[in-house]
Amino acid sequence: MAKLLAMILAGGEGRRLDPLTRERAKPAVPFGGRYRIVDFVLSNFANSGVLKMKVLVQYKSESLNAHIQRGWRLTALLDQYVEIVPAQMRVGPKWFEGSADAIYQNLNIITDEEPEFTFIFGADHVYRMDVRQMLQFHQDKGADLTVAAIPVPVEEASEFGIIEVDGDGRMIGFVEKPKAGVKTMPGDPTRALASMGNYLFTTDALVQEIVRDAGDTKSAHDFGKSIVAAMYERKRVFVYDFAKNVVPGQGDKERGYWRDVGSLDAYYQANMDLVDVDPSFSLYNDRWPIFTAQHNFPPVKFVFNNQTEGRVGYATDSLVSEGCIISGGHAHHCILSPKVRINSYSLVEDSILFENVNIGRHCKIRRAIVDKHVEIPANTTIGYDLEHDRKRFHVTESGIVVIPKAMRVEP
C-alpha cells in the first residue's frame, strides 16, 4: 500500500455556530450525544486504515486537544498516531491565514513523513466515507489532485465551491461560493456539484502548489479560492463522486449522506436526523463505527412510574447517553449527552441537551439546544414563546432556542 498521510484542518472558529463556539473550536462541538464533530473524519480515516493523522488546531483548541488526547490513542509501536499540531509560527509571528497557509506553515511535517499521497480533509462535517475508494480513483486517473464532491440544491450553491467536470470526471471549471450564474449539473438544472472540502494530493504536486501560493501576496491562501481554482487548468485535477462511495454496513438510504453543520439550524437538523426510527444517518453501524473518547459514567437510569400523577420517567424516539437520569420526566425526540437529568413532571421535546444539563421540575422545553452545565430552574418554559425567548437567549431563523454554556437561566 502506498505511504499515506492525513492532514486534518481543525482550526475553524465556527462563527455561525455561536454561542456553541464561544469557548470551543467548531470541531469540538458535541454531536449525537456522546461524540464531537471531529470524531467523524477521524473515524473515517481509522476505519479506512489510514492511521497517520495530523490534526491542525488553532482557535480555542483546549477542549479539542483534551478530547483527542483522551480518546484517540493509536498504537505508537506500529507508527500509528493521531497527533495534535498547534500553530507553530514557523514562517513568522502570525496565525494561519487560510487553509492553504495552515499546510504551508506545516510543510515540515509532510517532508519529514515523505508520503506518496496526502489527504487534506476538514474536521467539521458529518458523514461516513471509505477514503481508500477515493485513493483508488486518484491513482486510476493519474491525478495530481482529486476533489471529493456531492450534488447540492442550486439555492445552496453560494455556500460551496461549485465544480464543472467533463465526461471523464476531470475538472474544467471551479467557482468558490458563486453569488450568481451557478453552473448546474448536466441534465439537472436544480442541482450543482459542490466541493466537500476534502482533497487528495499526490504529495509532490501539493508541495509545489503550496509553495507557489505562499509566494503570491495577492492570494487568499485558501484551498478552494487559491489552490483548486488556480490548479485545474494546468494540472490533472479530477472530481470524485462521493455518492458512489460504499461503506460496509451502510444501507441505501444512508449512502451519500453528508452534512455541513456550519450553522445552528444545519447543526440542529443533522442531530435530529439521528433519532428517526429509520434514520438517514445511523450511529449503529458496527462495521464502520464512529469512535470517540470513553468516559467512566454509570448506566442510564429511568425512575418513577406514577401514571396517576403523571410522574413517569421515560424517553421516546431519543438518544440517551450514559450517566443520564430521567427522574419522573419525559424526553421525546431528543438527544441527551452524558449526565443530563430531567426531573419530575417536565417535558423536553425535539431538543439537544449537552453534558451535565439539569432540567428542574414542571419545565416545558421544545426545539432547544442547551450547552453544558446549564441549570434550568423549576417551572421554566422555553421554545413556546419565541419573542420572550429572544430577550433571554439566542433564537435562530427557524426558531431553535440556543442557550450558552453555563448560562444562569432565570425562570
From Swiss-Prot:
Function statement: Involved in the biosynthesis of ADP-glucose, a building block required for the elongation reactions to produce glycogen. Catalyzes the reaction between ATP and alpha-D-glucose 1-phosphate (G1P) to produce pyrophosphate and ADP-Glc.
Entry's Gene Ontology molecular function annotations: ATP binding; glucose-1-phosphate adenylyltransferase activity
Nucleotide-binding recorded as keyword: yes
GO biological process: glycogen biosynthetic process
Record's catalysed reaction(s): alpha-D-glucose 1-phosphate + ATP + H(+) = ADP-alpha-D-glucose + diphosphate
Protein name, entry field: Glucose-1-phosphate adenylyltransferase
Source species, domain of life: Bacteria
Assembly description: Homotetramer.
InterPro entries: ADP-Glc_PPase (IPR011831), ADP_Glu_pyroP_CS (IPR005836), GlgC_bac (IPR023049), GlmU/GlgC-like_hexapep (IPR056818), NTP_transferase_dom (IPR005835), Nucleotide-diphossugar_trans (IPR029044), Trimer_LpxA-like_sf (IPR011004)
The protein's Enzyme Commission number: 2.7.7.27
Record-linked Pfam families: Hexapep_GlmU, NTP_transferase
Family: Belongs to the bacterial/plant glucose-1-phosphate adenylyltransferase family.
HAMAP family, A to Z: GlgC (MF_00624)
UniProt entry keywords in alphabetical sequence: ATP-binding, Carbohydrate metabolism, Glycogen biosynthesis, Glycogen metabolism, Nucleotide-binding, Nucleotidyltransferase, Transferase
Protein's pathway: Glycan biosynthesis; glycogen biosynthesis
Protein residues bound to alpha-D-glucose 1-phosphate: 161, 176-177, 195
